[in-house]
Amino acid sequence: MKARRQRKILELIKAGLVKTQEDMVNALKECGFNVTQATVSRDIKELGLIKIPGGNNAFRYALPGDRPFIRGEERLRRVFRDSVIGLDSSENLIIVKTHPGGAQGVASAIDQAGWREIIGTVGGDDTILVVVKPKRAAGAVLKRFEELSGG
């Protein structure tokens, strides 16, 4: 069942029919799959889907191969500019706000950047918690994030 559902997700992505997880849930239900948003979220992560600009200030899901793969700092810069809409901090914690559905991709890019001051990220749908160690490095990390997001 999972393999069939994930094949259908890939078909829907290739057809450009889904822009949000809610769209995905509805499209899958129309195709006879009984799914929840949590199931779709896990499938998106397992399939490695990404959100890319789709025009008119909207984003859409795509396969990683639909966009040239960019590594390191340049990838982080692009992901931040495309997805991040706000930053805040408290002590050694930084909150990164993204467009809906953008948090997983941004959190992954942060993790892959390998900054030694960042010991981990937790990404939801539109919010990421970044844990910084040592605490005194949080200000510098926040400043780098602001620069990456164009702020």
UniProtKB/Swiss-Prot annotation:
GO terms for molecular function: arginine binding; DNA binding; DNA-binding transcription factor activity. Pathway: Amino-acid biosynthesis; L-arginine biosynthesis [regulation]. SUPFAM superfamilies: C-terminal domain of arginine repressor, Winged helix' DNA-binding domain. Pfam families: Arg_repressor, Arg_repressor_C. Keywords: Amino-acid biosynthesis, Arginine biosynthesis, Cytoplasm, DNA-binding, Repressor, Transcription, Transcription regulation. One of its GO terms (cellular component) is cytoplasm. GO terms for biological process: L-arginine biosynthetic process; protein complex oligomerization; regulation of arginine biosynthetic process. It is found in: Cytoplasm. Coiled coil: none annotated. Its main location: cytoplasm. The keyword Amino-acid biosynthesis applies. The keyword Transcription applies. Belongs to the ArgR family. This is Arginine repressor.
